[in-house]
Structure formats: structure tokens, C-alpha cells
Design a protein with these regions (language model features):
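An exposed acidic His-Trp-rich patch
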Residues: 30-37
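Low-complexity intrinsically disordered segments
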Residues: 39-176
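Short, extreme N-terminal segment that most often corresponds to the first beta-strand
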Residues: 1-30
């Protein structure tokens, strides 16, 4: 069973760009990895520019082949639908005219993640921050959920997340 989520970024013009993420959308998984590895506006924009996501963090590709080991660590990457490939029209990022419209997007998601970039030079937040909302019960307002600092899904001694910006953004891979 998948825990579906929607990942968005608040743009300068107060619109929101978002993508659907099919697997592991819980705060302990997607929330943790978004907060830890997608911590700047540029990284979030690159993530979203590739369209909908099967798994934000996966140890294998679409052929179910494990990613290689680097320095005795298992490589983890984002598994985008564009790499399968899927028709771009079906998986491209969604644009919402405001935050309310972002929350009204119904993907049967259980969590929504919104990245709030820093505003102007006066902002003490260098990189911006993530907010997580529980959208599993449509009869309730979406309460904010704390994103944990650690995750049972990640072992820093045995795993390494690698930014693979895929075919769409064509940005070279960066390791952190």
C-alpha cells in the first residue's frame, strides 16, 4: 500500500507548483528526505521540474536493478515517472494560482508538503523551510505535522542519497 503525497513550492508570485509522489509519503520518509536533502529553492525547483514521482528515494531503477554502491554505501535516488517513460502531459508539474488551490488538489493524497522559500535579503532563513500537512481525512482541516529529524528508513553509514535531476532539467548529478 502506498502513502501518497503532493510536494509543492510557494513561488515568488504566490502561486504554487506541485508534483504527485506515489510511495512513502509519510513525514518519517518523504518529510525527512525533503527536509534533509531538498533544503534550497533550487533543489526543490529541480525536483518539481521533473514531474510526478513514483518514489522520492529508491535504491533501484525502473528495471528493478539496484543503484551502484559508492564508498560502500547504497546509492538512493528519486524515481521519476519521466524516466519510465510516461507521457509528459500526464506527469508534468501542476501550477496552482494560490495556496488554497494547492490544498484543493485531490490526488487522494495523505500528506501535502509545501516548501516556503526565504523572502528577500532581510529573511534570517537562508534556505527556506518545509511544512507538512495531514490531508488523509477530507472532513477535517489539514493540520500541520512535525517533520522528524531522523528516519528509520535511512542509515547514513550504509546509504547515500544522490541528486539525479533526470531527463527534464538536465542538471548534472550532485552528491551531498
Amino acid at each position: 500500500m502506498s502513502t501518497r503525497s503532493v510536494i509543492g513550492i510557494l513561488n515568488e508570485d504566490k502561486t504554487v507548483s506541485s508534483v504527485y509522489s506515489h510511495y512513502d509519503g509519510s513525514p518519517e520518509h518523504n518529510g525527512y528526505f525533503l527536509k534533509k536533502y531538498f533544503d534550497t529553492t533550487e533543489k526543490v525547483q529541480n525536483l518539481i521540474s521533473n514531474g510526478d514521482i513514483s518514489s522520492l528515494v529508491s535504491d533501484q531503477n525502473w528495471k528493478r536493478e539496484k543503484h551502484p554502491m559508492i564508498n560502500n554505501k547504497q546509492v538512493l535516488k528519486t524515481l521519476y515517472y519521466v524516466d519510465r517513460p510516461e507521457p509528459w502531459e500526464n506527469i508534468k508539474p501542476q501550477k496552482h494560482k494560490n495556496v488554497l488551490e494547492f490544498f484543493q488538489r485531490d490526488c487522494c493524497d495523505e500528506f501535502k508538503y509545501l516548501f516556503i522559500p526565504p523572502e528577500g535579503n532581510w529573511n534570517f532563513l537562508k534556505n527556506g523551510f518545509w511544512k507538512c500537512y495531514d490531508t488523509s481525512d477530507p472532513t477535517k482541516s489539514a493540520p500541520s505535522v512535525t517533520i522528524p529529524e531522523t528516519s528509520r528508513f535511512f542509515n547514513n553509514d550504509k546509504q547515500m542519497f544522490v541528486y539525479g535531476f533526470s531527463k527534464v532539467s538536465k542538471v548534472k548529478e550532485l552528491t551531498k
